[in-house]
Amino acid sequence: KKGLSIPKNMYTKWFDCDKIKGTPVVRTRQTGDYITLAGGSKKALRRFMIDEKIPADMRDQVALLADGDHIMWVIGWRISSYYKIGPDTKRVLQVKIKKEEQ
């Protein structure tokens, strides 16, 4: 998608596939987006970006992997603790993000 800010190198992350409710999509932020932090607390994506000191002029361009309004991965920053694989994980989704050479 044009205008997405994707880190220059490749990233690979793994997610607990059975926790995904919809079809994950890569997109930019939308109203109502949230991420789950360690301990299970939810944080509005807007507040997460402020706390992580993501520059305001970049926030609308940061690439996200989203399951509805639940952010699975703020690409280049953090994955949601909700989707992390653990001892009870049966199926794993591997996601690779690589910026295409121009």
Where are the regions that the model predicts?
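Basic, glycine-rich polyanion-binding accessory segments appended to enzymes
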Residues: 1-102
